[in-house]
Amino acid sequence: MEFPDLGAHCSEPSCQRLDFLPLKCDACSGIFCADHVAYAQHHCGSAYQKDIQVPVCPLCNVPVPVARGEPPDRAVGEHIDRDCRSDPAQQKRKIFTNKCERSGCRQREMMKLTCDRCGRNFCIKHRHPLDHECSGEGHQTSRAGLAAISRAQGLASTSTAPSPSRTLPSSSSPSRATPQLPTRTASPVIALQNGLSEDEALQRALELSLAEAKPQVLSSQEEDDLALAQALSASEAEYQQQQAQSRSLKPSNCSLC
């Protein structure tokens, strides 16, 4: 007695057997019998989706877990940068010691990249204030600007210092003493920069630095070029002297009849 509605036929074209306990392929969702349910037996076209391999670190030979869809090379590289226990990886981590302080970033750099606003250290990708959502309030003056301001402050103090000859004698009688008028204090920024803006103060400081700069010492290449030029000029002078001596010692062929 047959039960045509019970079970299912195998999807393999060469089999087509009615199986009362059919099996479903988890890759292609086909129905197969127990003999053809394997990927290789029915030549499954979606078997590559189930071919999951775990990469192994080439330095410490430890399996590295990889998320689905993530390139294995990237996972192995991050493992070498963070968790690898081999000597080359640990030596590399000693060089890259400056960790990015942005939340979620584990990148390390050889040198510090400090934000001018918040003062924290970041990697190359998050060094700009917009990239790491900088919490620093306002715009701080740069180091060059601070140097220019201090230079301008020194110039202002020297230019505004009163000379001894211009000091007025104090009155002898207290009745003639005039009350001092209250002086208005300038804002700290204007007094610090002598009435100049930050850019003007920076330009003034750069001009003074260039004016006070000492003559640069010649490099080794320039010294070699100078010595070669002097040797050539000395050789040329010696050659001309020899030519002049040879002309003076050469006998004349002219004869007077």
Curated annotation (Swiss-Prot):
Changing residue 202 to A: Decreased 'Lys-48'-linked polyubiquitin binding. Zn(2+) 4 binds at residues 115, 118, 132, 134. A zinc finger (AN1-type) spans 4-52, 94-142. Residues 141-151 are annotated as: VCP/p97-interacting motif (VIM). InterPro entries: AN1-like_Znf, UIM_dom, Znf_AN1. Changing residue 173 to D: No effect on association with the proteasome complex. A motif (CAAX motif) lies at residues 254-257. Residues 152-184 are annotated as: Disordered. Changing residue 187 to D: No effect on association with the proteasome complex. Residues 197-216, 221-240 form the UIM domain. Zn(2+) 3 binds at residues 100, 105, 123, 126. GO terms for biological process: proteasome-mediated ubiquitin-dependent protein catabolic process; protein targeting to ER; regulation of insulin-like growth factor receptor signaling pathway; SRP-dependent cotranslational protein targeting to membrane, translocation. One of its GO terms (molecular function) is polyubiquitin modification-dependent protein binding. Binds 'Lys-48'-linked polyubiquitin chains of ubiquitinated proteins. Associates with the proteasome complex; upon exposure to arsenite. Interacts (via VIM motif) with VCP; the interaction is direct. Interacts with BAG6. Interacts with IGF1R (nascent precursor form). Interacts with DERL1, FAF2, NPLOC4 and UFD1; probably through VCP. This is AN1-type zinc finger protein 2B. The lineage of its organism: Eukaryota, Metazoa, Chordata, Craniata, Vertebrata.
